């Protein structure tokens, strides 16, 4: 069985094989217990797109890159916060959205939380599950370059054939549904 001592604020798992227990079965494809395939972490449909244009000495180049389909099951302290004992845990603002059923708690009541109650000593709430399976598809503006080519009649006065001034930026925008704690 997966875990014991269940309480309010724990994740509820479905008994898929109907045996009355939440378990991993025999861990085989024929007898997987209450597990099933819920995603695919392999990036599918990778893309890159170059766009460029010029007008009266000005030029603009854009490079987009991304993945159109990918599933991600977050794990570890960065996602869960309270994981691995009180001396090895980290807490960021999103981790404060955890289950609290005590109206006198300093952070207040939170019965509709994103995270289960924090538990350092038990991984039962951190099993692979659809609740925390994330869409890791993204599109990123990897590079933008904006430039201006000075007219040759001006540059030749300084014995220069060609002079271009430009400004460039990297990773300026990312569009994703992935949790803000992660960079796709």
What role is predicted for each listed range?
Residues 28-37, 42, 94-96, 124-132, ...:
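Extracytoplasmic loops and strand-loop junctions of Gram-negative outer membrane beta-barrel proteins
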Residues 33, 77-87, 178-184:
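Flexible, surface-exposed loop regions and adjacent strand-edge segments
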Residues 45-51, 58, 141-146:
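Hydrophobic, lipid-facing positions within transmembrane beta-strands of outer-membrane proteins
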């Amino acid at each position: 069985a997966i875990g014991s001592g269940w309480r309010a604020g724990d994740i509820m798992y479905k008994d898929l094989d109907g045996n009355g227990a939440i378990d991993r079965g025999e861990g085989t494809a024929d007898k997987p217990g209450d597990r099933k395939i819920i995603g695919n972490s392999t990036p599918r449909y990778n893309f890159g797109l170059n766009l460029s244009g010029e007008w009266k000495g000005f030029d603009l180049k854009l490079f987009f890159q991304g993945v159109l389909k990918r599933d991600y099951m977050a794990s570890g302290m960065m996602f869960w916060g309270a994981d691995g004992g009180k001396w090895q845990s980290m807490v960021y603002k999103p981790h404060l959205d955890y289950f609290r059923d005590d109206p006198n708690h300093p952070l207040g009541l939170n019965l509709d939380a994103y995270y289960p109650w924090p538990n350092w000593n038990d991984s039962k709430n951190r099993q692979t599950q659809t609740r925390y399976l994330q869409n890791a598809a993204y599109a990123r503006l990897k590079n933008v370059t904006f430039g201006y080519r000075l007219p040759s009649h001006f540059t030749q006065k300084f014995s220069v054939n060609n002079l271009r001034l430009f400004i460039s930026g990297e990773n300026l925008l990312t569009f994703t549904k992935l949790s803000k704690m992660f960079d796709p």
